[in-house]
Amino acid sequence: RGSXLTHLPLRNISD
């Protein structure tokens, strides 16, 4: 988390 993608509902992307 913190990839920047934390604003997305895709929490599957931990990194």
Swiss-Prot record:
It comes from the Eukaryota. GO terms for cellular component: extracellular region. GO terms for biological process: proteolysis. Expressed in chorionic epithelium (trophectoderm). The keyword Secreted applies. GO terms for molecular function: aspartic-type endopeptidase activity. It is found in: Secreted, Extracellular space. N-glycosylated. Keywords: Aspartyl protease, Glycoprotein, Hydrolase, Protease, Secreted. Belongs to the peptidase A1 family. This is Pregnancy-associated glycoprotein 62. It comes from Bubalus bubalis (Domestic water buffalo).
